[in-house]
Curated annotation (Swiss-Prot):
Gene Ontology MF annotations: thyroxine 5'-deiodinase activity; thyroxine 5-deiodinase activity
PANTHER family given in the database record: IODOTHYRONINE DEIODINASE, TYPE I IODOTHYRONINE DEIODINASE
GO cellular component: basolateral plasma membrane; endoplasmic reticulum membrane
UniProt keyword Transmembrane present: yes
Catalytic machinery residues: 123
Gene transcribed to yield this protein: DIO1
Keywords noted in UniProt: Cell membrane, Endoplasmic reticulum, Membrane, Oxidoreductase, Selenocysteine, Thyroid hormones biosynthesis, Transmembrane, Transmembrane helix
Catalytic activity field: 3,3',5-triiodo-L-thyronine + iodide + A + H(+) = L-thyroxine + AH2; 3,3',5'-triiodo-L-thyronine + iodide + A + H(+) = L-thyroxine + AH2; 3,3'-diiodo-L-thyronine + iodide + A + H(+) = 3,3',5'-triiodo-L-thyronine + AH2; 3,3'-diiodo-L-thyronine + iodide + A + H(+) = 3,3',5-triiodo-L-thyronine + AH2
Record-stated family: Belongs to the iodothyronine deiodinase family.
Record EC number: 1.21.99.3, 1.21.99.4
Subcellular location: Cell membrane; Endoplasmic reticulum membrane; Basolateral cell membrane
PROSITE patterns xrefs: T4_DEIODINASE (PS01205)
Function: Plays a crucial role in the metabolism of thyroid hormones (TH) and has specific roles in TH activation and inactivation by deiodination. Catalyzes the deiodiantion of L-thyroxine (T4) to 3,5,3'-triiodothyronine (T3) and 3,3',5'-triiodothyronine (rT3) to 3,3'-diiodothyronine (3,3'-T2) via outer-ring deiodination (ORD). Catalyzes the deiodiantion of T4 to rT3, T3 to 3,3'-T2, 3,5-diiodothyronine (3,5-T2) to 3-monoiodothyronine (3-T1) and 3,3'-T2 to 3-T1 via inner-ring deiodination (IRD). Catalyzes the deiodiantion of 3',5'-diiodothyronine (3',5'-T2) to 3'-monoiodothyronine (3'-T1) via ORD.
Name this protein carries in UniProt: Type I iodothyronine deiodinase
Length: 245
């Protein structure tokens, strides 16, 4: 690693640690104010509307040590981002559920847009909006192709865990990731599902953790969605595809 990257990582570590210390202190001294702040964040990801979770299932986990580790991983991973609108898309390797190694560009057909949906079953926002994504596949399959890339877990039971969530551990092997992806089959995805490599190459190059949406066309990134859960919006994909009809 270069000195510049190491310094950047150190700065991120200090920023995240400071925010966790301040957040934890606020939770102790001003619990009601902090709860309102966290609920306000939850509105952006529709977490407050998720019938599966009450605030007590997820809110108190903020500013924990596992929270710190996950946020740190996400922010460090973003330093590897190589996917930018109007620029060539990273042709990263992915693994089919039958074990075959493929690359993202192999799912492109002619000049048709390819929508990439990165996520995992322990990410409540990804699962809550999955039917909305499936509707996109149904409505636009005549003009576009779709691909789900199953990445590392957002809220693994042995990581930053939420109560009342699906119980999946962090993936130690590709077989673990494949087993986790089987849970997604219960949602009847209308497009192919592939696995990120255990080196998390797609997740890294697309800065996709914990969830993210992209549109590729002719080898370039034409739409880069915001980082989930707060800025993961399938309806933005609909707006772009409507213009391409």
């Amino acid at each position: 690693l270069s000195i510049r990257v190491l310094l950047h990582k150190l700065l991120i570590l200090l920023q995240v640690t400071l925010s966790v210390v301040v957040g934890k202190t606020m939770m102790i001294l001003f619990p009601d104010t902090t709860k309102r702040y966290i609920l306000k964040l939850g509105e952006k990801s529709r977490m407050n509307q998720n019938p599966k979770f009450s605030y007590e299932n997820w809110g108190p986990t903020f500013f924990s040590f596992q929270y710190l580790l996950f946020v740190l991983k996400v922010k460090w991973r973003r330093l590897e981002d190589e996917a930018h609108e109007g620029r060539p898309a990273p042709n990263t390797p992915v693994v089919a559920l039958n074990g075959e190694m493929q690359h993202l560009f192999s799912f492109m057909r002619d000049n048709r847009p390819l929508i990439l949906n990165f996520g995992s079953c322990t990410u409540p926002s990804f699962m809550l909006k999955f039917d909305e994504f499936n509707k996109l596949v149904k409505d636009f399959s005549s003009i576009a192709d779709f691909l789900i890339i199953y990445i590392e877990e957002a809220h693994a039971v042995d990581g930053w865990a939420f109560r009342n969530n699906v119980v999946i551990k962090n993936h130690r092997s590709l077989e673990d990731r494949k087993t986790a992806a089987q849970f997604l089959q219960q949602k009847n995805p209308l497009c192919p599902v592939v696995l990120d490599t255990m080196e998390n190459l797609s997740s890294s190059k697309y800065a996709a953790l914990p969830e993210r949406l992209y549109i590729l066309q002719a080898g370039n990134v034409i739409y880069k969605g915001g980082v989930g859960p707060w800025n993961y919006h399938p309806q933005e994909i609909r707006a772009v595809l409507e213009k391409l009809k």
